[in-house]
C-alpha cells in the first residue's frame, strides 16, 4: 500500500481512513507521509480511544482528526480526500451496509482521487479455508485461534466474491477497479474516480 500511495500522492495530501480500528495503519502512514493530513473514523468509541493513544506523544498529531461514527459522518467531507483507505472493514458489513459504505466513501474522494480497499472475499472451495487457517497461523494465531476464526466465518463475516466486490465498487461510482494483490482470499483493490 505504501508504494501505491508514494507513487500516486503529492505533498499536503488528504487521507481518509475509513474504519481506523486501533490506528495501526494510521500510525504507519502518519510516519511515512509527514505532510499529509488525516481523517480517521470508526464506529467504536473504544477503538478511537486506542488509536488516539498511539498519537499522545507524537509531534504534529494535530494532522489527524478522529471521529467516532460511520460513513454517515462523511457528509461534511464531500470531495475532500485524495485517497481513502478501507482496510479489513467491508467484509464485516452486510450487503446494504457495504453499498452505503462505499457510496459515501466515493462521495468524499475528490477527482482524480482513489480508494484502496483490502478485504477477505468469499471462498470458492474448502481448500481455501484451510489455506486461510495456515496463513493466519503463520502470522501468529495459534491453531486453536485459527480454528475459532474459521468457525465464526459465517457469523462474523459477510463475504462476497471478488467479482461482486468490483461490481459493487463500480456501482458506487468508481470508474475503474483492479486488484493489486491477493493473499489467500484477501484482495487489495484500487478503485479510481
Regions found by a protein language model. Give the residues of each.
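Short catalytic micro-motifs in class I SAM-dependent methyltransferases
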Residues: 88-91
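A short glycine-rich, Lys/Arg-flanked "PGG" loop and its adjoining helix->strand segment in the class I
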Residues: 99-111
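C-terminal alpha-helical "lid/dimerization" subdomain adjacent to the S-adenosyl-L-methionine
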Residues: 118-172, 178
Amino acid at each position: 500500500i505504501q508504494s501505491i500511495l508514494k507513487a500516486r500522492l503529492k505533498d499536503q495530501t488528504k487521507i481518509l481512513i475509513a474504519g481506523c480500528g486501533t490506528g495501526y495503519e494510521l500510525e504507519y502512514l502518519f510516519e511515512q507521509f509527514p505532510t499529509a493530513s488525516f481523517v480517521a473514523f470508526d464506529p467504536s468509541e473504544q477503538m478511537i480511544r486506542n488509536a488516539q493513544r498511539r498519537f499522545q506523544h507524537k509531534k504534529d498529531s494535530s494532522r489527524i482528526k478522529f471521529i467516532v461514527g460511520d460513513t454517515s459522518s462523511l457528509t461534511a467531507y464531500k470531495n475532500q480526500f485524495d485517497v481513502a483507505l478501507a482496510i479489513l472493514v467491508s467484509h464485516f458489513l452486510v450487503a446494504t451496509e457495504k453499498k452505503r459504505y462505499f457510496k459515501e466513501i466515493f462521495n468524499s474522494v475528490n477527482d482524480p482521487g482513489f480508494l484502496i480497499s483490502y478485504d477477505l472475499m468469499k471462498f470458492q472451495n474448502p481448500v481455501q479455508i484451510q489455506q486461510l487457517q495456515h496463513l493466519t497461523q503463520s502470522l501468529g494465531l495459534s491453531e486453536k485461534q485459527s480454528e475459532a476464526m474459521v468457525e465464526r466465518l459465517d457469523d462474523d463475516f459477510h463475504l462476497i466474491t471478488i467479482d461482486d466486490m468490483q461490481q459493487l465498487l463500480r456501482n458506487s461510482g468508481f470508474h475503474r477497479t483492479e486488484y493489486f494483490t491477493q493473499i489467500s482470499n484477501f484482495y487489495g483493490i484500487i478503485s479510481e474516480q
